[in-house]
């Protein structure tokens, strides 16, 4: 399913994505359940992204056995750091107001360069990924998130199946997402490369 087939307002995405346990990138119940069950306060903190790389709040090996330390280190120090560096260059070249959050740029990314789109998306997606992952995850979501998953997909297992399919069938690189729609139902989709559901593309 393309995300454009299930329109989601930016406001709804921002206010509900933490509550929905926005799941990104990698698949498997161990990784998916690492997402936060908390709602609005965390959403505002998570979704006011700066234009610079935030230090990682846990050791590179903290997510093992789901993600090994070397993969985390390379991803954080090379890939994500590269997106942040190149985003900084694009921001300077295009005179972007960095006093506002990156989300404001992503919401109007069609007005900016390909460099801004690729690196702004790459930086945002990775910053979100680092913030919503935790070494102390439960086996599966609980509380409101569990109820929302069951209501939207029928069961946690059905959700995992759809999420894994979205990730595995994305040609090349990209991200799988769990988002809240206008109808307050959760849905799964994917975006190519470093695009994300906040972008007006």
Q: What are these model-derived regions, one by one?
A:
Residues 46-48, 78, 84, 89-99, ...:
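All-alpha RGS (Regulator of G-protein Signaling) helical domain and cognate RGS-like helical scaffolds
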Residues 30-65:
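C-terminal segment of N-terminal export signals and the immediately downstream linker at the start
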Residues 62-66, 106-111, 192:
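Acidic/His metal-coordination segments adjacent to aromatic residues that form catalytic metal sites
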Residues 53, 188-190:
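Generic preference for hydrophobic
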Residues 1-12, 20-23, 29-30:
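N-terminal secretory signal peptides
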Residues 195-201:
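Short, intrinsically disordered, charge-balanced linker/junction segments flanking boundaries
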Residues 66, 70, 74-78:
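Soluble non-cytosolic domains of exported or imported proteins
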């Amino acid at each position: 399913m393309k995300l454009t087939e299930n329109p989601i307002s930016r406001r709804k995405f921002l206010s509900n994505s933490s509550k929905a346990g926005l799941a990104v990138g990698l698949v498997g119940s161990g990784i998916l359940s690492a997402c936060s069950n908390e709602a609005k306060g965390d959403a505002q903190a998570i979704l006011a992204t700066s234009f610079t790389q935030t230090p990682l709040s846990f050791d590179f090996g903290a997510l093992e056995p789901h993600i090994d330390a070397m993969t985390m280190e390379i991803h954080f120090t090379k890939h994500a750091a590269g997106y942040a560096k190149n985003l900084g260059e694009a921001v300077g070249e295009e005179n972007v107001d960095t006093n506002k959050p990156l989300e404001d740029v992503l919401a109007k990314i069609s007005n900016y360069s390909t460099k801004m789109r690729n690196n702004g998306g790459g930086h945002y997606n990775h910053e979100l990924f680092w913030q919503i992952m935790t070494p102390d995850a439960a086996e599966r979501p609980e509380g409101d998130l569990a109820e929302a998953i069951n209501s939207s997909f029928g069961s946690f297992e059905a959700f995992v199946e759809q999420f894994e399919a979205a990730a595995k069938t994305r040609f090349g690189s990209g991200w799988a997402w769990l988002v809240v729609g206008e109808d307050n139902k959760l849905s799964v989709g994917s975006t190519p490369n470093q695009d994300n559901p906040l972008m007006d593309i």
